[in-house]
C-alpha cells in the first residue's frame, strides 16, 4: 500500500484472497501428490493449512477494519462523517449527568501518577472501591481520562495469555465520570437500546447499556454506559427508544457495579461488527491504533474538548533528549530503544503504557521492587527523623548488631554508608591503612563503583584503549 496505494474495496478482499490462496495451495499439492506418490514433501503443509481453514477464529469485519487502519483508511464506512457530525453538534448534546461538566477536574489514574494497585497484578476489592481516595476525590464529581494507561485492570479477562504479565490491556478507551451511586444519567442524544445487561463478574461492568444512534446522513454509531445500577432491567428492553435528555439509568454502588467506586464508563464506538455487545473497555497498548479508530474519544458527546480529556503519557524521546542535554555524556542508558520506567513491583518494571518487563538485571530485585514492608519501614522512619551518624539513635546500633550477627565473630564493627561505591572506597582506605600497601588484586570484570578509588581497581575501565587510572 505504501508503494502502490490500494482502494478500500481491494483492502476488503485481502482476507478472502488469503484463504483462497491457501485453498489453491492445498488443491495443487493434492494434484501433484497424485502423480508423485513417493514424495511426501509435496503435501507436508496440508495438515496445518486444513487446520487453519477449518478452525480459524477471526472475525472478518474486525479484520477488514484492522487492514483498513493499517493502510491509513477509516476503519469503518462513514467514520469521518460520524466524527465530523459529533464534533459539529458538540455543546448541543444533553448533559449526561444533567449538569455542565466543563469545569470538572480531570484526575489521572495512570501508571505514572498513582500507586494503585499496590500489587499491579492484583487489584484488591478495597482498592477498587476506593479509587479516587488517593487523589482526594472520593466524594466529589470528577472525570477520568480517555486513552489513559492504567494498572487497575488485573482480572484474567484483561490479558491475552496464561500469565499475569501476558499482553495486558491497560489503555482506557472511555471517559469516566465519578459521582455518588444513584446519580441519574440522561441520554446525550436520541437513541435506541441495543444492549441492556447485568454483568455480575468481579471487576466487570455490573449494569451496562449500549445505545444505537443515527446521524442525519443515516450513519450509525453507538454509546456504552457501564457500572450502572441494574434496576434499569425492570423497564428497559432491546429496541426501546430513548429520547434526548431522558433519564434512563443511574450509577450503581460497588455491590452491583462490578465492585468499583461509583462512576460511569462512557464509551463511543463507530461499529459493533465483530464486537457486538462485548466491547473492550481497555486496549493493549500495542493494539491501540486500531482500537482508537473503532472507539475514538467521546469527549464531544459530553460537550467537552477532545484535547482536554485525552491523556498524554510522558514522551520517551523527549525524556531521552533531556537526559542527553542535562546529564553527562558518559552516563550510559541501557538498550538502543530505552525503557521509560513508570512503576515497579517485585521482579517486574512497567513502562509509561503499563507494559510489564521482567527485571533480572538490577540489584533491587534482591528484595523486590516496591517491597511493601521495606517501603513502610522507610516511610515510618522518614516521618520521624532522617539525619546521620553524628547523632545518637538506637536504630543505628540495632542495625549494626543485626548485620554483625550474620558474620563470623572476628568481624566486630561496621560502617554505615549510602552506596556500594562508598563501601568499596572505605574498604580500600582501611586495607591500605592497615597493610601499608597499595597494590590490589581484582578480577578483570565487575563493577566496583564510580569513585576515583573504585575506578582505579576496575579493569574494565583502565584496560580499554587509552584507559587511565589503574591503581
Q: What is each residue range found by the language model?
A:
Residues 25-80:
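ATP/Mg2+ or Mg2+-diphosphate-binding catalytic cores
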Residues 79-207, 244, 294-312:
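Surface-exposed, glycine-biased beta-strand/turn segments
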Residues 313-344, 363:
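Active-site-adjacent loop/helix segments that line or gate small-molecule/cofactor pockets in enzymes
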